[in-house]
């Protein structure tokens, strides 16, 4: 005896549903027990048939056709055929032969043990199981009773013989098993499978009741005192078709409780049968109505929930007096949710194993993410890791996705539709830019750790890919080379912007947290490449003064293209000499400390040592009563800077302020050891003797190799 053969999953669950075998699909095998080795041996004993064999499944389907024939002919013979025609008798015997073959075949068909769920192919166990269960019923439903009775009594049309023929209705259990498998078959619609089953049960009940009621009338001594004889006195001489249709008519009117009254019981036997039939109809009607109601309610439940949510949202908006535009956004959200509920992308993906989710995400999102400018040139591994974090979402028209001055938000890529980039100028909203398919938004605020500079609102029904800012940063940190390419793409994108519209209530955190250039956003978004921040307000080259107002202090910015030269000392900051330069007056409040920031940005021409794409930013920080210190940082457009040319900005950390508020920075070349760094700090800051260095995030640094070009280092005395 071999048990086991761990055989498939799919057909065990579907109870024997046949699926085409292939290396890329589920095979007809059973699930092994936990910890068992899968499929060591799938070969059954000799002459043993697998219940999942395609040929055996075809044989079962052929028998289903014969079962349907037997279910119809048995009640019909009992009621309408007193003498069985020889041709019909031959057909009956042929059908019985097929079922007799199936009885023999069953002794060689393996079965699944109900306790172990393993396939049993031992002949003795198969025989014992069959003999102790359905063998007797199968034999009785297949035995040729008419030839046996003719052999002993020579009366083949006896009523007892015909009643014994009803044992063939036992074969209907095969139809029940068939419908059970079809209901779980993904190739067939569940609704129509259930409807077919209910219709089949109803038709069979109508057929049997009509045949039995006619048999009672046909064998009643007084034909005129029967339900059919009362309206058709010579009904026995009528055609078989007329009598059969009349019987079905009575049966269906009684089943549906219509009861026209033209056909009714005339004798006690018929009355008794009608009572039993109508009692049966109560249960059958409850079964049919219950199942149909369940199917219909299940199909309309989504619509009912949608209408309830719309009504609740409308009442909520009216009760709280929400503006009309917000109310429309809420209603549009529910409408779109109803339309896309059937998709259930994320719910479905969460139910799948990680390997399948990876394949689906790679197939759907990889081409879209690859086309985004931010990821242009990054490695395929970076994209492959990123697609796993992408979620596809739908947004209705005019829905705000990101709000201006909102905290850090996620990054979005437009798959379809369009998104308007909106800015508020003097209280009025203006469309600054329109994001089309394949473009992205939200990346500036997320990557630069700043509030969102714009409001992003859908212009039409849009499908967006949302990338979590947290996961994006983690992936960037894990892929240092790709992060350089990515940030360079962001820099190039920002340099393409020629101007920035005036904004009300600018958030000063934008200036303090923006670590990419360490200059205000107005500087890197202006068309001109050189700015000057000094004490007094002047004008730009066009005699225009862009105003960025809205907080308690006014800010006026002027830009002018100038050329200047600067000399660089190895361990000192570059100092730019200003001659006849326009001036910008800036007042701001950072962390409750009001200081004046003077920013000067110089760009070299094509004859300079560096290319025109290299921008020199000189940031002067101080107050009117302090000596200004100059900080110069050059930001190249190349992907990286050679290790030998690492330059960092050192700050004297004051214990009564935060790290981000440390002032008086010095730009130096990074030495080879911390001791040299402390020595340079002592030279640059007189009377200061540092013994410890921390990063901008207050992380202690104990090895110069972890310091990157352009880092800001804060020296502490311990």
Swiss-Prot record:
SUPFAM superfamilies: cAMP-binding domain-like (SSF51206), Voltage-gated potassium channels (SSF81324). Residues 1-60, 110-132, 184-197, 291-718 are cytoplasmic. It is found in: Membrane. Pfam families: cNMP_binding (PF00027), Ion_trans (PF00520), KHA (PF11834). It comes from the Eukaryota. Residues 562-574 have a biased composition (Polar residues). The keyword Ion transport applies. Its main location: membrane. Residues 560-584 are annotated as: Disordered. SMART domains: cNMP. It is a multi-pass membrane protein. One of its GO terms (cellular component) is monoatomic ion channel complex. Keywords: Ion channel, Ion transport, Membrane, Potassium, Potassium channel, Potassium transport, Transmembrane, Transmembrane helix, Transport, Voltage-gated channel. The chain crosses the membrane at residues 61-81, 89-109, 133-153, 163-183, 198-218, 270-290. Residues 246-265 dip into the membrane without crossing it. One of its GO terms (molecular function) is voltage-gated potassium channel activity. InterPro entries: cNMP-bd_dom, cNMP-bd_dom_sf, Ion_trans_dom, K_chnl_volt-dep_EAG/ELK/ERG, KAT/AKT, KHA_dom, RmlC-like_jellyroll. The segment S4 is probably the voltage-sensor and is characterized by a series of positively charged amino acids. The pore-forming region H5 is enclosed by the transmembrane segments S5 and S6 in the Shaker-type (1P/6TM) and contains the GYGD signature motif which seems to be involved in potassium selectivity. PANTHER family: POTASSIUM CHANNEL AKT1, POTASSIUM CHANNEL KAT2. Probable inward-rectifying potassium channel. Assuming opened or closed conformations in response to the voltage difference across the membrane, the channel is activated by hyperpolarization. Belongs to the potassium channel family. Plant (TC 1.A.1.4) subfamily. This is Potassium channel KAT1.
């Amino acid at each position: 005896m071999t048990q086991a053969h761990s055989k498939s999953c799919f057909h065990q669950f579907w109870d024997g549903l046949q699926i085409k075998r292939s290396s890329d699909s589920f095979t007809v095998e059973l699930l092994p027990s936990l910890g068992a080795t899968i499929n060591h041996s799938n070969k059954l004993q000799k002459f043993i048939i697998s219940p999942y064999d395609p040929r055996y499944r075809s044989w079962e389907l052929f028998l289903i056709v014969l079962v349907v024939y037997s279910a119809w002919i048995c009640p019909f013979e009992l009621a309408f055929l007193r003498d069985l025609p020889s041709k019909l008798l031959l057909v009956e015997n042929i059908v019985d032969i097929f079922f007799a073959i199936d009885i023999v075949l069953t002794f060689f068909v393996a079965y699944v043990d109900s306790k172990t769920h393993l396939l049993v192919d031992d002949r003795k166990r198969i025989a014992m199981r069959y003999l102790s269960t359905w063998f007797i019923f199968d034999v009785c439903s297949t035995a040729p009773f008419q030839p046996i009775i003719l052999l002993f009594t020579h009366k083949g049309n006896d009523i007892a013989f015909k009643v014994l023929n009803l044992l063939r209705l036992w074969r209907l259990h095969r139809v029940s098993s068939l419908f059970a498998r079809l209901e779980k078959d993904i190739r067939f619609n569940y609704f129509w499978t259930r409807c077919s089953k209910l219709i089949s049960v109803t038709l069979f009940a109508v057929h049997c009741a009509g045949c039995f009621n006619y048999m009672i009338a046909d064998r009643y001594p007084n034909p005129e005192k029967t339900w059919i004889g009362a309206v058709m006195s010579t009904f026995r001489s009528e055609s078989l078709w007329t009598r059969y249709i009349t019987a079905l008519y009575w049966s269906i009117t009684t089943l549906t409780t219509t009861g026209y009254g033209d056909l009714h019981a005339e004798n006690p036997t018929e009355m008794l049968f009608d009572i039993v039939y109508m009692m049966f109809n109560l249960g059958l009607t409850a079964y049919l109505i219950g199942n149909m109601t369940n199917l219909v309610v299940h199909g309309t439940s989504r619509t009912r929930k949608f209408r309830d949510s719309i009504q609740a949202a409308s009442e909520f908006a009216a009760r709280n007096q929400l503006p009309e535009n917000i109310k429309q956004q809420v209603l549009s959200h529910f409408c779109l949710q109803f339309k896309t509920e059937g998709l259930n992308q994320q719910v479905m993906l969460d139910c799948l194993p990680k390997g399948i989710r990876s394949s689906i995400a790679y197939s759907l999102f990889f081409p879209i993410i690859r086309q985004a400018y931010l990821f242009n040139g990054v490695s395929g591994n970076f994209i492959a890791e990123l697609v796993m974090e992408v979620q596809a979402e739908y947004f209705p028209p005019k829905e705000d996705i990101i709000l201006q001055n909102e905290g850090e938000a996620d990054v979005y890529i437009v798959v379809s539709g369009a998104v308007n980039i909106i800015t508020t100028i003097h209280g009025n909203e203006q469309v600054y830019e329109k994001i089309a398919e394949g473009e992205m938004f939200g990346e500036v605020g997320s990557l630069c750790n700043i509030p969102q500079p714009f409001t992003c609102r859908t212009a039409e029904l849009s499908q967006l890919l949302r990338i979590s800012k947290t996961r994006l940063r983690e992936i960037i940190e894990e892929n240092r080379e790709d992060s350089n390419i990515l940030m360079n793409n962001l820099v190039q994108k920002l340099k393409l912007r020629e101007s920035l519209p005036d904004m009300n209530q600018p958030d000063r955190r934008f200036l303090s947290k923006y670590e990419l250039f360490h200059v205000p956003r107005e500087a890197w978004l202006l068309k001109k490449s050189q700015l000057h921040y000094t004490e007094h307000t002047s004008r730009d080259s066009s005699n225009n003064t862009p105003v960025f107002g809205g907080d308690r202090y006014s800010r006026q910015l002027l830009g002018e293209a100038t050329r200047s030269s600067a000399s660089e000392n190895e361990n000192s900051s570059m100092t730019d000499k200003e001659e006849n330069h326009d001036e910008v007056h800036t007042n701001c409040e950072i962390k409750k400390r009001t200081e004046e920031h003077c920013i000067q940005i110089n760009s070299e021409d094509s004859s300079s040592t560096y290319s025109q794409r290299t921008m020199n930013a000189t940031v002067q920080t101080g107050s009117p009563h302090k000596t200004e210190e100059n900080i110069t940082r050059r930001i190249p457009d190349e992907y990286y800077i050679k290790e030998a040319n690492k330059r960092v900005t050192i700050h004297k950390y004051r214990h009564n302020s935060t790290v981000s508020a440390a002032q008086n920075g010095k730009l130096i070349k990074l030495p080879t050891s911390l001791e040299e760094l402390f020595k340079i700090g002592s030279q640059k800051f007189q009377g200061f003797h540092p013994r410890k260095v921390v990063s901008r995030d207050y992380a202690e640094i104990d090895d110069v190799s972890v310091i990157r070009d352009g880092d800001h280092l804060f020296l502490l005395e311990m």
